[in-house]
Amino acid sequence: MPSFLFFGDTERSPAMRHELPVGIGDPFVLAVIDGKLHVVASDLERSRIEATAPGATVHGFKELGLFELLDQGLRHHEIDLELSSRAVATIGIREAVADPEMPVFIADRFRADGIVLHLDHEAIAARRRVKTEAEMAGIRRAQAAAEAACAPRRRSCAGPP
């Protein structure tokens, strides 16, 4: 089974939201290695990530040196690059299928770090096509709500018994 590597947020990336169904608006690194989820994100998100994905390995940006990078006066995009590089090194991934929507500056940094990326729309789409139990439960809730909303109209159009 290939490893998968993502960078972005779950608000704008359907692929990342599929892997980790919790709203996170700031960019972070997510990997799937041998079927196990690895997440490197803001420490503020740790409890929400652990509640949503109890089996995931979660690392916070603080443990990767966030405050030291801030003290160095780096700009936000430079911090994103360095934390992402450190995240991938911490996870230990050397080769992965990546979402072609990964930002170029991040993909370039990963490649400069020696990571082999295989950009593959089909592989990412195939993962999203297989719905998780949480996604199926959401679909069922939406269908039940739609049926309940349509029921009065259906009864009124049916005519007298």
PLM region spans:
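N-terminal accessory/capping or targeting/presequence segment of soluble
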Residues: 1-87
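Flexible, acidic/His-enriched mid-domain "rim/lid" segments that flank
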Residues: 77-161
